[in-house]
Amino acid sequence: MELEERRAALDVRRLPGLTPYAEAWELQRELVRKRRSGEIPDTLLLLEHPPVYTVGRAARDASNLGAGEEYLRSLGAEVFWSDRGGDATFHGPGQLVGYPIIRLKVRDTHRYLRDLEEVVIRALAGYGLEGRRHPRYTGVWVNGSKICAIGVKFSSGWIASHGFALNVNTDLSWFDRITPCGIREYGVTSLERELGREIPLAGVEREIVSGFREVLGDPGS
């Protein structure tokens, strides 16, 4: 039996505390290499970042960073130009970030994005919230505002990395300084805002993992 076959199960890793974006980025690169070679199974990283604005490959310039990188750094946030898909967004405490490092069983990048949306939609349903897709934009929306951003990278061997950022108890004022995902006509929201109370992240993590296994199963098996 090949090593790849022996390692079909999903490995879920919860990183403690706040993980700097650059550190998580380097970890993903290492895990992508190991996943490609079959050294590790499909892996889902769950974590929170300290305040950081990231800009994806869809951005043509820094125009969606509001007053600019220097100003954003003066607020106490990092600015990182990432190799993920998508445009500008914010990550910070109270936001659950998921980075699935998986080999796609179905080699369809658009379907994978819809699957990630479905994972989040099912997690939100566990809290009585109706998550919706938008006909023009990737992500998940609640009551007309974006609650989850999605940006993914696909590497050789059909290995996916990066993933989603779900606003749970996020300080949404950080988004006021940028044009999130380059979308001017809609705002952002969080579970805390929608439900009127702080939501324990551990419960959201359980819903995400459950939804991930329901929707994607063992993606690389």
UniProtKB/Swiss-Prot annotation:
Superkingdom classification of source: Bacteria
PROSITE patterns recorded: BPL_LPL_CATALYTIC, LIPB
The keyword Acyltransferase is annotated on this UniProt entry: yes
Keywords of this entry: Acyltransferase, Cytoplasm, Transferase
Active-site positions on this chain: C181 (acyl-thioester intermediate)
Pathway assignment: Protein modification; protein lipoylation via endogenous pathway; protein N(6)-(lipoyl)lysine from octanoyl-[acyl-carrier-protein]: step 1/2
InterPro entries: aa-tRNA-synth_II/BPL/LPL, BPL_LPL_catalytic, Octanoyltransferase, Octanoyltransferase_CS
GO biological-process terms attached to the record: protein modification process
Localization terms from the record: Cytoplasm
Gene Ontology molecular function: any one: lipoyl(octanoyl) transferase activity
Main EC class the enzyme belongs to: transferase
UniProt key word Disulfide bond: no
Binding site for substrate: R84, G85, G86, D87, A88, T89, F90, H91, A149, I150, G151, G163, F164, A165
GO CC term (a single one): cytoplasm
Coarse class of the protein's main subcellular location: cytoplasm
EC number assigned by the record: 2.3.1.181
Catalysed reactions listed for this entry: octanoyl-[ACP] + L-lysyl-[protein] = N(6)-octanoyl-L-lysyl-[protein] + holo-[ACP] + H(+)
Miscellaneous comment text of the record: In the reaction, the free carboxyl group of octanoic acid is attached via an amide linkage to the epsilon-amino group of a specific lysine residue of lipoyl domains of lipoate-dependent enzymes.
NCBIfam families registered for this protein in UniProt: lipB, PRK14345.1
HAMAP family recorded: LipB
Function, as annotated: Catalyzes the transfer of endogenously produced octanoic acid from octanoyl-acyl-carrier-protein onto the lipoyl domains of lipoate-dependent enzymes. Lipoyl-ACP can also act as a substrate although octanoyl-ACP is likely to be the physiological substrate.
Entry similarity comment: Belongs to the LipB family.
Name used for this protein in its record: Octanoyltransferase
UniProt organism field: Rubrobacter xylanophilus (strain DSM 9941 / JCM 11954 / NBRC 16129 / PRD-1)
Gene that this polypeptide is encoded by: lipB
